[in-house]
Curated annotation (Swiss-Prot):
Matches recorded under PANTHER family: 50S RIBOSOMAL PROTEIN L15 (PTHR12934), LARGE RIBOSOMAL SUBUNIT PROTEIN UL15M (PTHR12934:SF11)
Gene: rplO
Keyword rRNA-binding annotated: yes
Protein name: Large ribosomal subunit protein uL15
Aminoacyl-tRNA synthetase is among the record's keywords: no
Subunit structure: Part of the 50S ribosomal subunit.
Organism classification: Bacteria, Bacillati, Actinomycetota, Actinomycetes, Mycobacteriales
Amino acid sequence: MSEPIKLHDLRPAAGSNKAKTRVGRGEASKGKTAGRGTKGTKARKQVSAAFEGGQMPLQMRLPKLKGFKNPNKVDYQVVNIADLAEKFPQGGDVSIADIVAAGLVRKNELVKVLGNGDISVKLNVTANKFSGSAKEKIEAAGGSATVA
């Protein structure tokens, strides 16, 4: 039986690793112009990948965008009081954690309660923000709207 192959005995197959041709290293081996032809921009340097051959460049053809991104913008996840009334028909205290557990919003984000729909049960809602109509409807039903 032959000996097992060992890692230090491994060699690439003959002719599989061809040496890279080093151009511009003497007349005998692609020296002088080194395969670039004679004269001109491409013989002297690389042309920028963004250069479009004198055609108006893409970044200049596209329209400018107006406005800016407000760094102070606060994004709220919204939930309507109709959804709260549907998920909590027994009434009682409703915190942000309860709203997340009910699947109305994602966790770790701010919650705003909006006044779309009607509410008949008494809910003591705690959220990060309330619309005016939501606050009125919750308080009209006998509940309270507390900002967390």
